[in-house]
Structures are given as C-alpha cells and as structure tokens.
C-alpha cells in the first residue's frame, strides 16, 4: 500500500537528484553535465580496422592518421543510449567529442572535432558521410570526459514514453533504434 511516507520519500529522492545534477553543473561549468547519445551518428558498425579502411581517405585529407585517431577519445565511437559525462572546455582539440547546439534548436549534437581554426570548429559524426556546418565556441556546451555504455538508455525510454503521452512524434536523432533502448 502506498503511504504518505512513500510519497515523501519519492519527493525527497527527486529533490536530492535535482540538487545533485545542479551541483554537477556548477562543478563542471556546463548546464548539461550528463547527456545521452540519441542517434547512431557516432556508431562504428564494424571493427576499428575495417571502419578505418572505409573512412581513411576523409581523415587523411585532414592529416589525421590511423594512429592519431586511435589516440582520440572513444576511437571506436559511441552507441545510441551511451551516457556521457561533460565538462566545459573553451579550447577543445581535434579528436575531442563535443556537445553543441545549433541556434534555434532544442537538440544537442554529439560529434567529434575533425578540424579547427581559431574559435571555429568542424565536427563530424564518425558514422556520417560528411562533416557538419562549422560551429563557434559559443555553440559548444562542453567536451565529453568519459562515456558509460548504454546507461543513458533508460532516459531515452522515458523520453519516448513521455512523447507518447503528450502525442508528440518522437525523433531520437532519426537513426536511434528503439529496439535497442
């Protein structure tokens, strides 16, 4: 039986979680210290050597070697549902996985920096055929510090369930398979 005490414990748990998230935002310097990967744009669908064989021409044009790429954060890419921990970084490097937003969009994008000059960055999803339009430093939300495979899946499932109740068509990046969530 659900009691007032149970309700109070649930409310307290939500408040503690919210306070923890806000504290994490202050410590990391970004309003988004934890994000979930919502598309397959960073997914490597094959072993690294095979993946590199199909992508090497693009990266070679940018003077990024196979050895360079293997030293980048998450050289084997990210999967839909991975949970990322983010920190503010006003000077990310080539190879860093960054989170950014486009003006007028509510969505954030998780892609890798493949080129830069001054405070302009070219990003690309490892699984995408072409790079994104350039972004500025002001669009950056942060840089990925580490990833925890699939721990973001419950958040995506809750987002999907909420969208069903609200009657909003769900688009988890256009490529994220709900069967894997």
Pin down the residues of each PLM region:
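Protein maturation boundaries and topogenic segments
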Residues: 1-92, 148-181
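Short, charged/polar surface micro-motifs in flexible loops or helix N-caps
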Residues: 91-93, 104-106, 116-119
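Short aromatic-glycine motifs in intrinsically disordered, low-complexity regions
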Residues: 65-67, 94-105, 124-132
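Short beta-strand-centered aromatic/proline hotspots
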Residues: 96-98, 109-115
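Solvent-exposed, polar/charged alpha-helical surfaces in well-ordered, non-transmembrane soluble domains
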Residues: 79-82, 93-96, 138, 142
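Short coil-to-beta-strand transition motifs
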Residues: 30-32, 102-111, 132-138
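Extended, hydrophilic extramembrane loops/domains of integral membrane proteins
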Residues: 114-161
